[in-house]
Every structure is written in structure tokens, then in C-alpha cells.
Regions:
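Short N-terminal targeting/anchoring amphipathic segment
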Residues: 5-24, 38
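Conserved catalytic-core segment of nucleotide-activated headgroup transferases in glycan assembly
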Residues: 77-78, 83, 88, 95-99, ...
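Conserved acidic donor-binding segment of nucleotide-sugar-dependent glycosyltransferases
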Residues: 242-250, 258-263
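A charged, aromatic-enriched C-terminal amphipathic alpha-helix characteristic of glycosyltransferases
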Residues: 264-294
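Active-site proximal beta-strand in glycosyltransferases
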Residues: 32-50
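Acidic donor-binding loop of glycosyltransferase active sites
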Residues: 11-12, 80, 197-211, 222-224
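Membrane-proximal helix-turn-helix segments that form the acceptor-binding/catalytic region
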Residues: 45, 60-82
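Short hydrophobic beta-strand element within catalytic cores of glycosyltransferases
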Residues: 215-219, 225-228
Length: 295
């Protein structure tokens, strides 16, 4: 703190992120520095917690929701401008106070590359990617196991679910010990790229969470055909045009089965996701949104 205070005229901007971290420093910065404060929230934590409470009904989650709602709006009022990775958070914040300076930015950027024309007849199985320190990913595997995979196996016993993600819980491990699951756990970037190339469909059956999902953007950048929920697709403009979206377990299983052997549609979805990445998720597109804040 002393270094910042003693050099307060040397900094034009201070970039804070994550509410539980930013709240420790923002008052000090405001009181002792002249820098413009930019806050990046990643997602609205209270939205995610509210959805978890609505689904699970846990009183501790309700307490956390109220705590983070107060915390996050305190930061929004104290920052000069706040960034979030999708328009959904901006809409939610503007409902509370339209005067708050908040922007949806591109949190993910890629170099433009040639479109991959994948031969889906040479692929197999379905892929889930998500770290299991994050509760919504554990819930997604639970929902898959209880309500989706049995419907798939009843129609096509050859389809396996490949599960990628660090720190799998005991529940996830036990589920994956049953037939039809292949638990990879943590994998290297190269191995993950191979899995994107080798599997037929990427699924993200998220029932709660908030904000744009990195796992979805990553799958799009790798030319995946994607099936997800409205929560999984949240914040991605025009998502229904290049991925399958449903919140119903029976329909989710049906979408997998319907798409699995439709190589033409798989290819079309793959091409469209890559076009969206090349058009929207570039350094130039990101800079155009924020450049005025750094003048």
C-alpha cells in the first residue's frame, strides 16, 4: 500500500477484479491516489448465487447472495467504470441504477484463423469440460447422470461421456466409475485440443451460474458442435443460430441423439461457431469497446 501511496502520481489507471479482492483496495485507492479506477467483475456473483438458491434452497446460499449483492454494488458505485463479459450483467445492473457506468467487453480474444472443416464421421462420443471446484459443474454432471445419460444409453449404448476438469469431487468420481463415462480430470492444453478434435459434440448442461461461460467460448474457438442450456448460452449474442439450447432433460438427450449422426448439421454448426469467433472475439473488437476509457 505504501508504494502506491508514495507514487500516487505515477499511476493513471488502477484495474481491480473479483469482488472479494477489489473491496480490500478500492477505498484506499480512492482516498490516496488520483488514478482512474476500472473494475472487472467476471460475472455478477449474486446472480449466480440467487439461481443456486432458487434451485437448491440452501439458506447459506441465500446469505451469500445478499452479501455479494451488497458488495458488488458497493464496488460499482465506487469505480469510475466497470466491465463485465456479457450484456446480461449490464442489463441487470442498469435495472437497478441506469446511471452506473458499466460496459460489456470481450473477455476472450483470439487471432483470426482459417475455418476448420472437420470430418465428423471420424469422431465419437460427447465431451464435458469444466473444473469441479466450481459447484455448477458438479451439478451439471449430477443432472447428466440422473436425467440425461440414461435416456441416451437407452437409445445408443455406444455413446460415452468424456469428462474433463480439475479437482473432480468424490461424487463426480463415483459417477464416472459407472459404465459410459470416461473421467480424464485435468488435462494439458494439447490433450484438450485433441479431445475437441476427436469428440463429436461438446455439452454444457449448466442449470445455474451467471455470465458468459469460458468453456463455451473455448469450444466455439475449437470448432465444436455445442449443446447447452440457456444458462450455458447466457450472454452470447444470437447463440440459437449456432448451438443447440434446451433446459429440459428429455429434450437435451433428444438433441444429442438427433445431432449425433447428422454429420452435415454438425459441420454447419462447427463452421458457424468459428465464424462468430473470428468476427466478434478479436483484439480489435475488444479495444474498440474500451479505448475511450483509456484516453
Amino acid at each position: 500500500m505504501g508504494i502506491l501511496k508514495n507514487n500516487k502520481r505515477s499511476f493513471d489507471f488502477v484495474f481491480l477484479n473479483r469482488p472479494h479482492i477489489a473491496i480490500k483496495y478500492i477505498d484506499f485507492i480512492r482516498q490516496n491516489m488520483y488514478a482512474k479506477v476500472i473494475y472487472y467483475g467476471h460475472d455478477l456473483h449474486y446472480m449466480r448465487l440467487q439461481r443456486e438458491y432458487d434451485l437448491m434452497g440452501d439458506e447459506k446460499t441465500l446469505y451469500d447472495f445478499k452479501y455479494y449483492r451488497n458488495l458488488e454494488y458497493s464496488l460499482l458505485y465506487k469505480a469510475d467504470v466497470s466491465y463485465y463479459p456479457s450484456y446480461k450483467e449490464v442489463e441487470e445492473i442498469k435495472k437497478v441504477d441506469d446511471t452506473l457506468r458499466v460496459k460489456a467487453i470481450n473477455a476472450y480474444m483470439f487471432d483470426e484463423k482459417d475455418i476448420i472443416h472437420r470430418d465428423f464421421s471420424k469422431t465419437k462420443d460427447i465431451l464435458f469440460v469444466g473444473g469441479f471446484s466450481h459447484d455448477p459443474n458438479v451439478d451439471a454432471i449430477r443432472w447428466l447422470h440422473e436425467s440425461i445419460m440414461p435416456r441416451i444409453k437407452a437409445r445408443n449404448s455406444e455413446i460415452n461421456l468424456i469428462v474433463v476438469g480439475s479437482n473432480p469431487t468424490e461424487e463426480v468420481i463415483n459417477i464416472c466409475n459407472e459404465g459410459g463415462y470416461i473421467l480424464k480430470g485435468f488435462v494439458s492444453d494439447d490433450e484438450l485440443l485433441n479431445l475437441y478434435n476427436e469428440t463429436r459434440i461438446v455439452i454444457a448442461p449448466l442449470r445455474y451460474g451467471a455470465g458468459i461461460k469460458g468453456k463455451i467460448i473455448e469450444a466455439m474457438a475449437n470448432g465444436a458442435a455445442i449443446i447447452t442450456t440457456n444458462c450455458g448460452a447466457e450472454g452470447i449474442v444470437d447463440a440459437p443460430y449456432f448451438m443447440k439450447i434446451t433446459d429440459d432433460a428429455q429434450d437435451f438427450a433428444g438433441q444429442i441423439l438427433k445431432l449425433y449422426d447428422n454429420f452435415e448439421e454438425l459441420k454447419n454448426l462447427s463452421i458457424e461457431t468459428q465464424k462468430v469467433i473470428n468476427r466478434r472475439f478479436t483484439m480489435e473488437a475488444a479495444w474498440n469497446i474500451v479505448k475511450d476509457d483509456f484516453e
